[in-house]
Amino acid sequence: MANDNRRTVTVYGATGAQGGAVARSLLKNHAFKVRAITRKPDSEAAKALRALGAEIVQGDGWSKEQMVAAFSGSWAAFVNTNSDDPCFVDGHPPTEVDLGKIIIDAIIEAGTVKHLVYSSFVDTSSFTNGQASIKAADMKAKVQRYAADSGHFDTVCPLYQGWYMGIFLRQDYARALGGFPYFQDEDGFRTLHLPRWGTHTDMPIPWISLEDDFGDIVHGIFLEPENYNRRVVPTVSDVCTYPEVMDAVHALATGQKAQYIPVTDWEAHFGDSHHGRESLTIFKFGHFTNGKYFGHEPISTDISAYLKSKAAEAQGKDPSDRKLITLSEWFEKHVAPLI
Protein backbone atom coordinates (compact mmCIF):
# COMPACT_ATOMS: atom_id res chain seq x y z
CA MET A 1 0.00 0.00 0.00
CA ALA A 2 2.94 2.34 0.62
CA ASN A 3 3.72 2.39 -3.07
CA ASP A 4 0.26 3.82 -3.84
CA ASN A 5 1.58 7.22 -2.77
CA ARG A 6 4.55 7.19 -5.10
CA ARG A 7 4.83 10.15 -7.44
CA THR A 8 5.12 9.21 -11.09
CA VAL A 9 7.94 10.81 -13.04
CA THR A 10 7.73 10.15 -16.77
CA VAL A 11 10.95 10.19 -18.75
CA TYR A 12 10.91 10.98 -22.46
CA GLY A 13 13.99 9.53 -24.13
CA ALA A 14 14.34 6.97 -21.35
CA THR A 15 16.52 4.57 -23.35
CA GLY A 16 18.95 7.34 -24.29
CA ALA A 17 22.04 8.32 -22.34
CA GLN A 18 20.45 11.21 -20.43
CA GLY A 19 17.00 9.73 -19.91
CA GLY A 20 18.36 6.35 -18.94
CA ALA A 21 20.57 7.90 -16.28
CA VAL A 22 17.60 9.83 -14.85
CA ALA A 23 15.37 6.76 -14.80
CA ARG A 24 17.98 4.57 -13.11
CA SER A 25 18.62 7.15 -10.40
CA LEU A 26 14.92 7.71 -9.63
CA LEU A 27 14.29 3.96 -9.48
CA LYS A 28 16.61 3.82 -6.46
CA ASN A 29 14.20 6.05 -4.53
CA HIS A 30 10.99 4.30 -3.48
CA ALA A 31 9.18 7.64 -3.28
CA PHE A 32 9.03 7.71 -7.08
CA LYS A 33 7.48 5.58 -9.75
CA VAL A 34 9.25 5.81 -13.10
CA ARG A 35 7.44 5.65 -16.42
CA ALA A 36 9.81 5.28 -19.34
CA ILE A 37 8.73 6.31 -22.84
CA THR A 38 10.44 4.57 -25.74
CA ARG A 39 9.70 3.87 -29.37
CA LYS A 40 11.17 0.40 -28.94
CA PRO A 41 9.81 -1.31 -25.80
CA ASP A 42 11.51 -4.58 -26.76
CA SER A 43 14.99 -3.04 -26.95
CA GLU A 44 17.66 -4.22 -24.54
CA ALA A 45 17.75 -0.78 -22.91
CA ALA A 46 13.99 -0.88 -22.30
CA LYS A 47 14.19 -4.42 -20.93
CA ALA A 48 16.92 -3.34 -18.53
CA LEU A 49 14.78 -0.49 -17.19
CA ARG A 50 11.79 -2.79 -16.85
CA ALA A 51 13.93 -5.20 -14.84
CA LEU A 52 14.77 -2.34 -12.45
CA GLY A 53 11.08 -1.59 -11.92
CA ALA A 54 10.22 1.01 -14.54
CA GLU A 55 6.89 1.05 -16.32
CA ILE A 56 7.66 0.90 -20.04
CA VAL A 57 5.34 2.79 -22.37
CA GLN A 58 5.64 2.75 -26.14
CA GLY A 59 5.38 6.18 -27.66
CA ASP A 60 6.61 8.25 -30.58
CA GLY A 61 7.21 11.92 -29.86
CA TRP A 62 5.73 12.91 -33.20
CA SER A 63 2.37 11.45 -32.15
CA LYS A 64 0.59 13.88 -29.85
CA GLU A 65 -2.06 11.27 -29.08
CA GLN A 66 0.55 8.77 -27.91
CA MET A 67 2.31 11.42 -25.84
CA VAL A 68 -0.91 12.50 -24.10
CA ALA A 69 -1.53 8.90 -23.08
CA ALA A 70 2.08 8.41 -21.99
CA PHE A 71 2.18 11.47 -19.72
CA SER A 72 -1.33 11.15 -18.27
CA GLY A 73 -1.31 10.69 -14.52
CA SER A 74 2.30 11.83 -14.14
CA TRP A 75 3.37 14.24 -11.43
CA ALA A 76 6.55 15.34 -13.21
CA ALA A 77 8.46 14.84 -16.43
CA PHE A 78 11.99 14.82 -17.75
CA VAL A 79 12.30 15.49 -21.47
CA ASN A 80 15.33 15.27 -23.73
CA THR A 81 14.99 15.25 -27.50
CA ASN A 82 17.78 13.85 -29.64
CA SER A 83 19.43 16.63 -31.64
CA ASP A 84 21.40 14.02 -33.59
CA ASP A 85 18.30 12.27 -34.91
CA PRO A 86 18.82 11.70 -38.65
CA CYS A 87 15.54 13.47 -39.41
CA PHE A 88 17.09 16.77 -38.26
CA VAL A 89 20.31 16.53 -40.27
CA ASP A 90 19.20 18.35 -43.44
CA GLY A 91 17.91 21.37 -41.53
CA HIS A 92 14.50 21.27 -43.19
CA PRO A 93 11.17 20.94 -41.34
CA PRO A 94 10.14 19.26 -39.23
CA THR A 95 12.72 20.52 -36.76
CA GLU A 96 13.62 19.75 -33.17
CA VAL A 97 11.47 22.74 -32.18
CA ASP A 98 8.49 21.13 -33.88
CA LEU A 99 9.06 17.88 -32.01
CA GLY A 100 9.54 19.65 -28.70
CA LYS A 101 6.34 21.64 -29.06
CA ILE A 102 4.33 18.51 -29.83
CA ILE A 103 5.64 16.91 -26.64
CA ILE A 104 5.02 20.02 -24.52
CA ASP A 105 1.50 20.44 -25.91
CA ALA A 106 0.79 16.78 -25.16
CA ILE A 107 2.05 17.11 -21.59
CA ILE A 108 -0.21 20.13 -21.11
CA GLU A 109 -3.19 18.26 -22.55
CA ALA A 110 -2.48 15.29 -20.29
CA GLY A 111 -3.25 17.72 -17.49
CA THR A 112 -1.44 16.30 -14.49
CA VAL A 113 2.26 17.17 -14.88
CA LYS A 114 3.20 19.90 -12.42
CA HIS A 115 6.97 19.89 -12.76
CA LEU A 116 9.05 19.76 -15.93
CA VAL A 117 12.80 19.37 -16.22
CA TYR A 118 13.77 20.12 -19.81
CA SER A 119 17.17 19.26 -21.25
CA SER A 120 17.93 22.63 -22.79
CA PHE A 121 20.88 24.90 -23.41
CA VAL A 122 21.86 28.55 -23.58
CA ASP A 123 20.31 30.53 -26.43
CA THR A 124 23.61 31.01 -28.24
CA SER A 125 22.21 33.37 -30.88
CA SER A 126 20.90 35.76 -28.24
CA PHE A 127 24.02 35.48 -26.11
CA THR A 128 26.34 36.30 -29.02
CA ASN A 129 23.99 38.62 -30.93
CA GLY A 130 23.99 36.12 -33.77
CA GLN A 131 27.77 36.05 -34.08
CA ALA A 132 28.34 32.46 -32.95
CA SER A 133 25.23 30.31 -32.78
CA ILE A 134 24.77 26.58 -32.24
CA LYS A 135 21.62 25.39 -34.00
CA ALA A 136 20.73 22.51 -31.68
CA ALA A 137 21.28 24.66 -28.58
CA ASP A 138 19.01 27.41 -29.85
CA MET A 139 16.25 24.96 -30.73
CA LYS A 140 16.31 23.43 -27.27
CA ALA A 141 16.22 26.90 -25.73
CA LYS A 142 13.16 27.81 -27.81
CA VAL A 143 11.22 24.76 -26.65
CA GLN A 144 12.15 25.33 -23.02
CA ARG A 145 10.90 28.92 -23.25
CA TYR A 146 7.73 27.70 -24.95
CA ALA A 147 7.09 25.39 -22.00
CA ALA A 148 7.83 28.07 -19.41
CA ASP A 149 5.70 30.67 -21.18
CA SER A 150 2.73 28.29 -21.42
CA GLY A 151 1.84 29.07 -17.82
CA HIS A 152 0.71 25.47 -17.32
CA PHE A 153 3.48 24.13 -15.11
CA ASP A 154 4.16 24.89 -11.48
CA THR A 155 7.87 24.70 -12.29
CA VAL A 156 10.00 24.45 -15.42
CA CYS A 157 13.70 23.81 -14.88
CA PRO A 158 16.09 24.32 -17.83
CA LEU A 159 18.97 21.87 -17.66
CA TYR A 160 22.35 22.66 -19.27
CA GLN A 161 24.72 19.74 -19.86
CA GLY A 162 28.46 19.82 -19.46
CA TRP A 163 30.71 18.06 -21.94
CA TYR A 164 30.23 14.33 -21.74
CA MET A 165 33.16 12.54 -20.16
CA GLY A 166 31.82 9.53 -22.00
CA ILE A 167 33.20 10.75 -25.34
CA PHE A 168 36.50 9.35 -24.12
CA LEU A 169 34.96 5.86 -24.02
CA ARG A 170 34.22 5.80 -27.74
CA GLN A 171 37.00 4.39 -29.87
CA ASP A 172 35.24 5.67 -33.00
CA TYR A 173 35.71 9.19 -31.63
CA ALA A 174 39.31 8.62 -30.60
CA ARG A 175 40.72 9.03 -34.11
CA ALA A 176 38.90 12.36 -34.46
CA LEU A 177 40.36 13.43 -31.11
CA GLY A 178 43.90 12.71 -32.32
CA GLY A 179 44.01 9.15 -30.98
CA PHE A 180 43.31 10.03 -27.35
CA PRO A 181 42.91 8.06 -25.14
CA TYR A 182 43.19 4.69 -26.94
CA PHE A 183 45.86 5.04 -29.60
CA GLN A 184 49.51 5.98 -29.19
CA ASP A 185 51.46 7.97 -31.75
CA GLU A 186 54.93 7.00 -32.94
CA ASP A 187 56.46 8.64 -29.88
CA GLY A 188 54.25 6.72 -27.46
CA PHE A 189 51.94 9.63 -26.62
CA ARG A 190 48.17 9.50 -26.49
CA THR A 191 47.48 12.83 -28.15
CA LEU A 192 44.40 14.99 -27.76
CA HIS A 193 44.11 17.13 -30.89
CA LEU A 194 41.27 19.66 -30.75
CA PRO A 195 40.84 23.43 -31.11
CA ARG A 196 41.63 25.48 -28.04
CA TRP A 197 38.62 26.11 -25.81
CA GLY A 198 38.66 29.85 -25.28
CA THR A 199 39.90 32.89 -27.16
CA HIS A 200 43.61 33.13 -26.42
CA THR A 201 44.28 30.58 -23.71
CA ASP A 202 42.85 27.27 -22.47
CA MET A 203 39.70 28.02 -20.50
CA PRO A 204 37.98 25.64 -18.07
CA ILE A 205 35.48 23.18 -19.52
CA PRO A 206 32.53 21.80 -17.52
CA TRP A 207 32.54 17.98 -17.68
CA ILE A 208 29.67 15.68 -16.74
CA SER A 209 29.62 11.94 -16.16
CA LEU A 210 26.26 10.65 -17.33
CA GLU A 211 27.04 7.27 -15.81
CA ASP A 212 27.94 8.54 -12.35
CA ASP A 213 26.30 11.91 -11.72
CA PHE A 214 23.80 13.18 -14.29
CA GLY A 215 20.83 11.11 -13.18
CA ASP A 216 21.38 11.96 -9.53
CA ILE A 217 21.53 15.68 -10.31
CA VAL A 218 18.15 15.56 -12.05
CA HIS A 219 16.83 13.34 -9.25
CA GLY A 220 17.82 16.07 -6.81
CA ILE A 221 15.75 18.63 -8.71
CA PHE A 222 12.65 16.46 -8.38
CA LEU A 223 13.15 16.36 -4.61
CA GLU A 224 12.63 20.12 -4.37
CA PRO A 225 11.38 21.36 -7.77
CA GLU A 226 10.01 24.63 -6.38
CA ASN A 227 13.58 25.78 -5.79
CA TYR A 228 14.49 25.44 -9.47
CA ASN A 229 11.60 27.03 -11.31
CA ARG A 230 13.06 28.91 -14.30
CA ARG A 231 16.46 28.49 -12.67
CA VAL A 232 19.17 27.07 -14.89
CA VAL A 233 20.84 23.97 -13.50
CA PRO A 234 24.22 23.30 -15.13
CA THR A 235 25.08 19.60 -14.81
CA VAL A 236 28.79 19.48 -13.98
CA SER A 237 30.88 16.74 -12.39
CA ASP A 238 34.23 18.52 -12.67
CA VAL A 239 35.80 21.59 -14.26
CA CYS A 240 39.09 21.11 -16.14
CA THR A 241 41.05 22.62 -19.02
CA TYR A 242 42.45 20.37 -21.73
CA PRO A 243 45.94 20.44 -20.14
CA GLU A 244 44.32 19.34 -16.87
CA VAL A 245 42.67 16.46 -18.74
CA MET A 246 46.20 15.38 -19.66
CA ASP A 247 47.19 15.61 -16.00
CA ALA A 248 44.35 13.22 -15.18
CA VAL A 249 45.77 10.68 -17.60
CA HIS A 250 49.30 11.11 -16.29
CA ALA A 251 47.98 10.32 -12.81
CA LEU A 252 46.70 6.90 -13.87
CA ALA A 253 48.46 3.92 -12.38
CA THR A 254 48.98 2.69 -15.96
CA GLY A 255 51.76 5.26 -16.43
CA GLN A 256 50.46 6.52 -19.77
CA LYS A 257 51.97 9.51 -21.57
CA ALA A 258 49.51 12.05 -22.94
CA GLN A 259 49.72 15.44 -24.59
CA TYR A 260 47.37 18.12 -25.86
CA ILE A 261 48.15 19.80 -29.19
CA PRO A 262 45.73 22.55 -30.24
CA VAL A 263 44.29 22.41 -33.74
CA THR A 264 45.01 25.47 -35.87
CA ASP A 265 43.04 24.66 -39.05
CA TRP A 266 39.56 24.10 -37.63
CA GLU A 267 37.72 23.64 -40.92
CA ALA A 268 40.12 20.98 -42.16
CA HIS A 269 40.04 19.22 -38.81
CA PHE A 270 36.26 18.90 -38.59
CA GLY A 271 35.52 18.37 -42.28
CA ASP A 272 32.18 18.81 -44.00
CA SER A 273 30.06 16.11 -42.36
CA HIS A 274 26.97 17.10 -40.38
CA HIS A 275 28.64 16.20 -37.09
CA GLY A 276 31.81 18.00 -38.12
CA ARG A 277 29.94 21.20 -38.96
CA GLU A 278 28.03 21.07 -35.69
CA SER A 279 31.26 20.54 -33.72
CA LEU A 280 32.84 23.49 -35.49
CA THR A 281 30.01 25.80 -34.39
CA ILE A 282 30.55 24.75 -30.77
CA PHE A 283 34.22 25.69 -30.86
CA LYS A 284 33.47 28.96 -32.64
CA PHE A 285 31.05 29.73 -29.80
CA GLY A 286 33.78 28.92 -27.27
CA HIS A 287 36.26 31.15 -29.08
CA PHE A 288 33.82 34.05 -29.38
CA THR A 289 32.71 33.89 -25.73
CA ASN A 290 36.13 33.02 -24.30
CA GLY A 291 34.89 29.68 -23.06
CA LYS A 292 31.56 30.75 -21.55
CA TYR A 293 29.93 27.42 -22.35
CA PHE A 294 26.84 28.13 -20.26
CA GLY A 295 26.52 31.75 -21.33
CA HIS A 296 25.86 33.95 -18.31
CA GLU A 297 25.74 30.95 -15.97
CA PRO A 298 28.98 30.32 -14.06
CA ILE A 299 30.94 27.17 -14.78
CA SER A 300 30.85 25.55 -11.36
CA THR A 301 30.06 22.25 -9.66
CA ASP A 302 28.26 23.91 -6.73
CA ILE A 303 24.64 23.28 -7.75
CA SER A 304 25.38 19.81 -9.08
CA ALA A 305 27.22 18.83 -5.91
CA TYR A 306 24.28 19.88 -3.76
CA LEU A 307 21.71 18.05 -5.89
CA LYS A 308 23.85 14.93 -6.14
CA SER A 309 24.16 14.86 -2.35
CA LYS A 310 20.40 15.23 -1.83
CA ALA A 311 19.61 12.44 -4.29
CA ALA A 312 22.21 10.11 -2.83
CA GLU A 313 20.83 10.77 0.65
CA ALA A 314 17.31 9.94 -0.58
CA GLN A 315 18.66 6.70 -2.02
CA GLY A 316 20.12 5.78 1.37
CA LYS A 317 23.75 6.03 0.32
CA ASP A 318 26.54 6.57 2.82
CA PRO A 319 27.89 10.12 3.11
CA SER A 320 31.14 8.96 1.51
CA ASP A 321 29.20 7.98 -1.62
CA ARG A 322 27.38 11.27 -2.17
CA LYS A 323 30.07 13.22 -4.03
CA LEU A 324 30.50 14.06 -7.69
CA ILE A 325 33.15 12.11 -9.55
CA THR A 326 36.28 14.02 -10.59
CA LEU A 327 37.76 13.64 -14.05
CA SER A 328 40.78 11.85 -12.58
CA GLU A 329 38.53 9.41 -10.76
CA TRP A 330 36.46 8.93 -13.90
CA PHE A 331 39.52 8.06 -16.00
CA GLU A 332 40.71 5.63 -13.33
CA LYS A 333 37.29 3.96 -13.18
CA HIS A 334 36.23 3.89 -16.82
CA VAL A 335 39.27 4.35 -19.06
CA ALA A 336 42.24 2.80 -17.26
CA PRO A 337 40.85 -0.76 -17.61
CA LEU A 338 40.60 -0.25 -21.39
CA ILE A 339 44.12 1.05 -22.06
From Swiss-Prot:
One of its GO terms (biological process) is alkaloid metabolic process. InterPro entries: NAD(P)-bd_dom_sf, NmrA-like, NmrA-like_oxidored. Notoamides have been shown to exhibit antitumoral activities. Notoamides A-C show moderate cytotoxicity against HeLa and L1210 cells with IC(50) values in the range of 22-52 mg/ml, but the IC(50) value of notoamide D is greater than 100 mg/ml. Moreover, notoamide C induces G2/M-cell cycle arrest at a concentration of 6.3 mg/ml. Its EC number is 1.-.-.-. The keyword Oxidoreductase applies. NADP(+) binds at residues 13-18, 39-43, 60-61, 81-83, 140, 164-167. One of its GO terms (cellular component) is nucleus. It holds the Pfam family NmrA. One of its GO terms (molecular function) is oxidoreductase activity. The keyword Oxidoreductase applies. Gene3D superfamilies: NAD(P)-binding Rossmann-like Domain, UDP-galactose 4-epimerase, domain 1. Keywords: Alkaloid metabolism, NADP, Oxidoreductase. It comes from the Eukaryota. Belongs to the NmrA-type oxidoreductase family. NmrA-like family domain-containing oxidoreductase; part of the gene cluster that mediates the biosynthesis of notoamide, a fungal indole alkaloid that belongs to a family of natural products containing a characteristic bicyclo[2.2.2]diazaoctane core. The first step of notoamide biosynthesis involves coupling of L-proline and L-tryptophan by the bimodular NRPS notE, to produce cyclo-L-tryptophan-L-proline called brevianamide F. This is NmrA-like family domain-containing oxidoreductase notA. It comes from Aspergillus sp. (strain MF297-2).
